[in-house]
């Protein structure tokens, strides 16, 4: 069984996968102060609830955009699961070209999304990830990563409005019925929702124009379903895209086992 860890700026997602598919997925808020032992107490409780044990895990892979979390996540894998985790980075075997000026600067999550989207849906395509940042990543027909766009995330934009403007409240995200708001909250919701819909549509059109081809548009991230309701541009929603990318990367880059008595990998892990 493969332990998959996707560490983002807001949340860390843990998942396990075997020949039958995804056996469990769990999410915890990102906290730079949390230790490997604290992760272990939390995760082992959830594994027990799923009728799994650390001995069921034979490999691990970590994707992170939070360097401060990596040390403790590695220790978690080594100390509690006795496996040496693969850490996603540009220098690994991805199975495709990374056609940007500085590949090492590209966030692992963006490459993982590109890998999984092309494997699942074929190219050419663009992946829109509604995360802490809103990213657009372009993949050509052969699967090569062509670069993309990074914009402020939706929650980040909302928080910036609240922090920078004394009279603007902190609000939740929802789809307003009309563009023209009749109150402050409605106006803010419209600005965020329809403003981002406009960016999605406008940016996709500009990317397609520059790329010279019609692209499939795959969306991921927690807010993907909400924003897909407001546009016809998004053709697929895949909430597990980054996890699937980590699984595929682990298949291409097997790692040594710390405990040779458990040195086996279930077919399909």
Curated annotation (Swiss-Prot):
The active site is at 109 (proton acceptor). One of its GO terms (molecular function) is ATP binding. A monovalent cation. Ammonium or potassium. Its cofactor is NH4(+); K(+). One of its GO terms (cellular component) is cytoplasm. It is an enzyme of class 2 (transferase). Pathway: Cofactor biosynthesis; coenzyme A biosynthesis; CoA from (R)-pantothenate: step 1/5. One of its GO terms (biological process) is coenzyme A biosynthetic process. It is found in: Cytoplasm. Substrate binds at residues 107-110, 184. ATP binds at residues 6-13, 132. It catalyses: (R)-pantothenate + ATP = (R)-4'-phosphopantothenate + ADP + H(+). It comes from the Bacteria. SUPFAM superfamilies: Actin-like ATPase domain (SSF53067). The keyword Metal-binding applies. NCBIfam families: baf (TIGR00671), PRK13318.1-2 (NF009844), PRK13318.1-6 (NF009848), PRK13321.1 (NF009855). Homodimer. Catalyzes the phosphorylation of pantothenate (Pan), the first step in CoA biosynthesis. This is Type III pantothenate kinase. It comes from Granulibacter bethesdensis (strain ATCC BAA-1260 / CGDNIH1). The gene is coaX.
